[in-house]
Amino acid sequence: MMLASSAPTAPSLLPPSSQPSAATTRADDCSSSTSPTNTSASDASMEMLTSLMNGAVAAAAAPGNALVKQESPPLTTPPLFNPDLALLQFSQLFQAQQAMVQFHNQQKQQQQIIQQQQQQQQQQQQNQNPSQSQSSSSDRKRSYPCTFQYCVICQKDVHSSKLPCHIRQCHVAKPMFQCPACDFTSTYSKNNVKSHMVSLHGLAGDPISYMDKYAGQVEEFMKLCFPNVRGRGRPMQGRSSPKSPTSPTQPGRRGSQASSLPSRRNTVSQNDLLATLQQHQQQQAAFHPLRNLRFNPLQSIFPAVLANNNNNSVLATNKHVNNFLIKQEESEVPPITMPMQDLKTMLDANSSPSPISLSSSIIPIQPIKPGENAQPKYMKSLDWTILNDLQMKGTVFADCRSNMELYAENIARKIENTKAFQSFVLSDDMRTVVEEVRSRVSIQLFEVMFAIHRMDIKVLNQNLVDSLLQIAPTNSDAQLLRKMENLSDPNEEFLLGLTKIDHIEEKLETMKHMYRFPEQVELLKENIIKYEIAVKVLSESRALRNVMQLVLAILNIGFFDDRQCLSINGFSVSDISSILSTNTPSGQSVQSILVTILKDEINLDLDELFGLIDVLEKIENDDVNSVAQDLMVLDDKTVRAEKEMEHSGSNIPLSEFVENAKTISKERWEHFKSLKTSIERLTIYLGSPLPRHQNLDAHSPFNNVLQMLRSLKTAIELDDASDDHHINVSSP
């Protein structure tokens, strides 16, 4: 104890007033290290605290050292080594480290929670089922509310997932997939054709696809059949338009729009964002029908609401509904193209006229010749033909309305100086016709207008349609009628009412075609059957074959004395007239020898032979080429009816007529192709095979045989008359 108390105090290098307080310095260091983000300061404080503690332990152990012999004064503890202050500094440092660890753990937990929420949402959207959608229906509106859609043309419900298949199978009705090894096709199922390829041919791979060929037609039928559906079977409600900028860029499964949206951390939740987008899309879809809405003064007469089998009223937003009045604001009629394959003429020896294809080509045709319509009926000074809007497309006059703006004013000033313009004049003859039509109409004018607009043949009979077509004002006549200020004549008022019907001539022509199509098709069928009977009779007639062989024998024996008929193998029946008039070396004509043989040969049935004359006379004045031309005319009228149906909107009776007309026309074309093949075989049978570069004269074989039979019959009758006269003269 004496040694410890007498130990000398360590000398100080600084004066007492200038030495800094160790407690103050250490306190400042500790206070600087309490920040949870200053990690370097906390590390330095730990090192300083460790060194100070080691020094304190060494100082406390010094008095107990028995080897120290030097005496020193009593040891006084500096303020730095105050136990309370050291414990305070250590606790502050420990709290700073714990705060840093807790902060980093919270960050990691938040990231994990966000990732788990995203994964759960994606998994729920991918694995959702009808039961889950029903349970969540109270919380949010279903994204796919319509399970079935109503087909306007078929008038039945179709499942929403089967809309394109329904279009391809029921309306387009064209082979979409074909087996590459055979003619097996399917209108909608690719798997059926693949199964056929594997099971019957052992082929792997995909079948031949025609989907792209009929894609445009499928889209057009989609608009007609399901006017309240957008895209590939997607209802308008709760769905974004395919062209909307908010639509996902990648096609995904149903209800996967949320998964395609980028996640935004610490900004807006995904549910809020999806709800906002969905609300915006619903508002846009609800506002869309009101964009092009036009006032219709006849809404009380013609309702603007359509009902379907789902007991849902659908607003008739289709532009074709209740639009039979002409829209004066439309300056141009949209271009109408009638896609169909080019029909080859009957003179082509290699191929037959192909049946009409209304949607397999993009080549526009002109089924209306210039002057057939749009020709003014009430302007006698115009004796030249006028083109309609369809015929004007692609001509030198196509851009006249835009290019003549610079010259129109100058031309108008020069013409206005004369003050002489064409006016509407109702001649006496036309006035009589209009009065007769008005007297035959038993309904009011607006009912006539609506019947023409709907092309309703149940309201207007065929004679009335023909009469209305005769007096219907064209576009030029309508311009003059509208300029008239005072219309006191009821006939002029009746004509002015007809001018308000859009495409009135085309609609009346369509109704006329609907009336006359069955009769014309039946007439064509009868003509084809008459030719088929003539071909069959000539091909199977035993008497005709014997006569041709007798002529061949006469030529061989009469000219070459060849009783085995080896010199001349045969001849063309087309030359039979010149052959019969040829004289043999004996001075006898071939016809005289043949007539003598026919009279003496009892095995030949002359009644059967000359009975062919009655069959051939039935087609003597007909022409096979006219059958093909009549079929083409009917097809053109069907094209006009189909285009008018597309322009006027959905019309179920007209749609059924067009489909039926296409089917019947296809059958008649097949019938005609079969007839042409039979005529070609008959031509070969009669010894007139044609090379590929020579055209077939389908009427020649029948005329040649008919002339030969008439000549033989006349010669036999004359010979019989001369024999009777000789018998009468020689008898007593």
Swiss-Prot record:
Signal peptide: 1-27
InterPro entries assigned to the protein according to its UniProt record, in alphabetical order: FH2_Formin, FH2_Formin_sf, FMNL_animal
Regions of compositional bias (Polar residues) in chain numbering: 256-267
GO molecular function, one term: actin filament binding
Result of knocking out the encoding gene: Double RNAi-mediated knockdown with sem-2 results in no sex myoblast production.
Keyword Signal found: yes
UniProt xrefs under SMART domains: FH2
Superkingdom of origin organism: Eukaryota
Gene3D superfamilies noted in UniProt: Classic Zinc Finger, Formin, FH2 domain
Coiled-coil boundaries: none
Known tissue expression: Transiently expressed in all mesoderm derived progenitor body wall muscle cells before they differentiate.
Biased composition (Low complexity): 1-12, 19-45, 121-137, 240-251
One GO biological process term: cell migration
Keywords (A to Z) from UniProt: Signal
Pfam entry (one): FH2
Family of the protein in this entry: Belongs to the formin homology family.
Cited function: Acts redundantly with hlh-1 to promote body wall muscle cell and coelomocyte specification in postembryonic mesoderm progenitors, probably through suppression of sem-2.
Protein name from the UniProt record: Formin-homology and zinc finger domains protein 1
Gene name of this polypeptide: fozi-1
